[in-house]
């Protein structure tokens, strides 16, 4: 997507954490690079995991920016396809259905920030120095 800023270590950390967590679980996983404010709106139970350089937590919702394996993309291709075929609320409805069956995690604190409407539930990730991140990405 074109409205994210990524920390320089984002890909490296996500790949290292993917390898660590998926090998511990013995299965492929989904990973979201952002820690969204909407993840704090419900009193949803979560698990905290140790990643490569930070903690991660299990989540049940993402937007459309995530990392996963080709195996899981192929397995859930119908969900991704249905997500684009018609309008529904939320937009990610069919993607989020996947997380009822599969493991999805997001970092604490964020490796990417979604530069969206700060007043939306997606908002800006907490505890980020946005000026520094912007300057690093010039």
Question: Model-derived features: where do they sit?
Answer:
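C-terminal catalytic/acceptor-binding lobe
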Residues: 70-138
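Short acidic donor-binding/metal-coordinating loop in glycosyltransferase active sites
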Residues: 1-2
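Conserved catalytic core of nucleotide-sugar-dependent glycosyltransferases
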Residues: 5-79
């Amino acid at each position: 997507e074109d409205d994210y800023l990524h920390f320089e270590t984002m890909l490296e950390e996500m790949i290292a954490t993917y390898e660590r967590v998926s090998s511990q679980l013995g299965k492929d996983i989904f990973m979201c690079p952002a820690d969204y404010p909407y993840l704090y709106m419900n009193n949803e139970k979560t698990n905290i995991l140790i990643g490569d350089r930070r903690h991660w937590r299990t989540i049940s919702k993402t937007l459309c920016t995530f990392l996963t394996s080709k195996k899981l993309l192929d397995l859930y291709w119908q969900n991704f396809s249905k997500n684009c075929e018609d309008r529904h609320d939320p937009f990610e409805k069919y993607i989020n259905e996947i997380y009822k069956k599969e493991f999805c995690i997001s970092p604490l604190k964020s490796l990417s920030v979604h530069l969206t409407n700060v007043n939306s539930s997606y908002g800006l990730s907490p505890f980020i120095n946005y000026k520094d991140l912007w300057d690093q990405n010039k």
